Regions:
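N-terminal Sec-pathway targeting helices
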Residues: 1-15, 573-577, 592-599
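Secondary-structure capping and domain/repeat boundary segments
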Residues: 43-55, 83, 485-567
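Middle-to-C-terminal accessory/interaction subdomains
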Residues: 170, 288, 296-347, 353-499, ...
């Protein structure tokens, strides 16, 4: 064995080195085609993305008037018109929307070019392997350099050392990840004010990329107080296009954002299942899980004050409620949640803060599963945020109690008519379509890059037309309840195998109409059982009270509802496998050659 190692040590070392380089991503065979873009004097590499349809080159808006230089593996070429371009040649003549013929490894494959419009570009550079490390855990942090360029190509910010980290709860499991950014020094990014901490929202469950932005804009325009500002950016990491993100101010207590004095604090309602992930959590007298997010070292009196707030909400005393809460802020946040159909309203990511001796609701956050995008909020003609019961084990305590208050209801109706309805009318008539049109090119690029993920997750029509239709129907329903005083009852259906409810609004003393809802079986074959008593409810009888009904089907019906999950991510990168196999084969060839050489007798010696 010792002789074997001595004779073959060089080959073994070469094999090991190639394997390590492959694992680090430094030496991968057949690197994808790329272009080098000159952005405000700096060169940025943009690598093409490959799927079953060929290669896709996603260029940022700032590349429109920039010089482009082609990067190709040895022997590869790109046909542009009558010209054959090879590695290092100018390719500024390529146009978005065109498909070019790429010769790679002796085969012709299509290369489709896209270019964004109206959107800034965020370039991040990290060491090889950094993103894999980050994706192993949200607790992992890494350093990167950052370059932010406006759509016109002007540099807006550069930072040689930003801290990059994963974030999110349910959104973290998706292939397109959300991140947090911490700059080395506070800076004003795209006109949102100077700060060090920022968030990159991935909108992985929102193919329209509109939901979070619309909810934030609705809150800001309604006067809810400080609301995180946001801008769309195309994100590139080490030359790879990660898609369209929403660069957003982080919810923090600091000057220029949510401003709090000594003795004041910011809290967030969360699911109890997330207890171990929370910083400074506690449970209220009624069992709510609350996280103290600011200050970092809270005063011992915070829990007692929150319990006083909770007692006032459930007291039934409007005078006490007005003395304890800023009722208008709670009404405004409720209106944002109800209008948007926020399924997590008053359950998770639900912020409130204590300032000037009273409790305020807000800022708003997390609307990527709103606007009818799930079975739980798909019906626009229903109350979604108001019902106290959201499902088995899911209780919206505060909204449920507040909606019983005459003071709260009167402020909801007045604010809806005076402030929210004009905003909704502008959104429906102009604003949503205008925003969607401005993102058309960026959304197309994002949806092609993440087509496989979206196909797996899709639960609702992602088109702008569907969003407009949903919001229009929702506005019509809420106006009938709050302006026309139609008396509604809420009926919630629990399907077998589901722990959440489907909400319906029924005019008092009318029959629930389920004709437009696919129950996967004939209505006559389903038993509707009252959740409170277990008694059978005649679905053809008038509804006189709020009801939760559990559906009981004949054996074998309905088929189980698929639960969308993020597609599994393989830890094996094909390029790494190819490089490792190549290194192994090279080593094997070397060993065979060495073995043959060792077996050959010296010249002039008898065998």
């Amino acid at each position: 064995m010792r002789t074997f190692l001595q004779k073959n040590l060089p080959w073994l070392l070469i094999s090991a080195l190639l394997g390590v380089l492959a694992l680090l991503g430094v030496c991968q065979p057949d690197a994808p085609p790329c272009v080098y873009v000159s952005v405000d004097g700096q060169i940025q590499k943009i690598s093409a993305y490959e799927n079953a349809d060929g290669y896709h080159l996603f260029l940022p808006a700032c590349a429109q008037n920039a010089r482009l230089q082609l990067g190709l593996p040895a022997g590869a070429s790109l046909r542009v018109g009558d010209a054959i371009l090879t590695d290092g040649m100018d390719c500024s003549s390529i146009e978005p929307g065109r498909v070019y013929s790429l010769t790679l490894r002796g085969e012709e494959v299509p290369l489709t070019v896209y270019r964004s419009e109206n959107t800034a570009a965020l370039f991040l550079q990290t060491r090889p392997g950094t993103m894999d490390y980050l994706h192993e855990s949200k607790d992992h942090k890494a350093t990167a350099s950052l370059l932010l360029c406006a759509a016109d190509g002007t540099q807006r910010h550069a930072d040689p050392s930003v801290t990059l980290k994963g974030r999110g709860n349910a959104t973290w499991k998706y292939e397109k990840k959300p991140y947090s950014l911490t700059l080395s020094t506070p800076a004003d990014l795209l006109g949102m004010g100077a700060a060090a901490e920022w968030v990159l929202l991935a909108n992985a469950t929102d193919q329209s990329n509109l939901y979070n932005r619309l909810a934030l804009d609705l809150a800001a325009q309604s006067g809810l107080g400080w609301t995180p500002d946001s801008r769309y950016v195309e994100v590139y990491v080490n030359g790879s296009y990660l898609g369209l993100y929403l660069l957003t101010e982080k919810i923090t207590a600091q000057p220029g954002r949510l401003e709090l004095d000594s003795g004041e604090f910011l809290c967030k309602i969360e699911f109890s299942s997330r207890w171990n992930t929370l910083r400074n959590p506690f449970r209220t007298a009624r069992g709510r899980t609350v996280e103290i997010t600011a200050p970092k070292v809270p005063d011992a009196s915070v829990a007692a004050l929150v319990n006083e707030m909770e007692a006032a909400i459930f007291s039934g005393d409007d005078a006490l409620l007005a003395a304890t809460l800023d009722v208008d802020s709670w009404a405004r946040r409720y209106l944002v949640d109800e209008i948007c159909g926020n399924i997590d309203a008053d359950l998770a990511s639900s912020y409130f803060y204590y300032r000037d001796g009273r409790f305020y609701a807000g800022p708003v956050w997390d609307y990527d599963r709103a606007f009818g995008s799930t079975p739980r909020n798909h019906n626009p003609r229903s109350f979604i945020a108001a019902p106290a019961e959201k499902g088995v084990g899911y209780r919206s305590l505060y909204y449920g109690a507040l909606c019983k208050s005459a003071l709260f209801q009167s402020r909801v109706r007045a604010l809806y008519e005076e402030e929210f309805l004009p905003i909704l009318q502008a959104l429906l008539q102009v604003d949503i379509q205008t925003l969607s049109d401005s993102l058309r090119a960026a959304t197309q690029m994002n949806n092609i890059r993440w087509a496989e993920m979206f196909a797996h997750l899709q639960e609702a029509d992602p088109s702008t037309g569907a969003l407009l239709q949903y919001l229009s129907a929702r506005t019509e329903f809420l106006s009938s309840a709050w302006l026309e005083n139609v008396d509604y009852r809420t009926v919630q259906l629990q399907l077998p195998g589901s722990d959440t409810y489907r909400n319906f609004a029924v005019e008092a003393r009318c029959v629930l109409d389920l004709s437009g809802y696919d129950l996967k079986a004939d209505l006559s074959d389903i038993r509707f059982l009252r959740a409170d008593t277990g008694a059978v409810f005649d679905i053809h009888s008038p509804v006189t009270e709020n009801l939760i009904l559990k559906l009981e089907y004949p054996r074998g019906l309905p088929p189980a509802e698929p639960v969308p999950e993020a597609p599994a991510q393989s830890p094996w990168d094909p390029a790494i496998i190819a490089a490792s196999l190549g290194a192994f084969m090279l080593c094997l060839l070397g060993l065979l050659t060495a073995d043959r050489r060792n077996r050959r007798p010296p010249s002039g010696r008898q065998q």
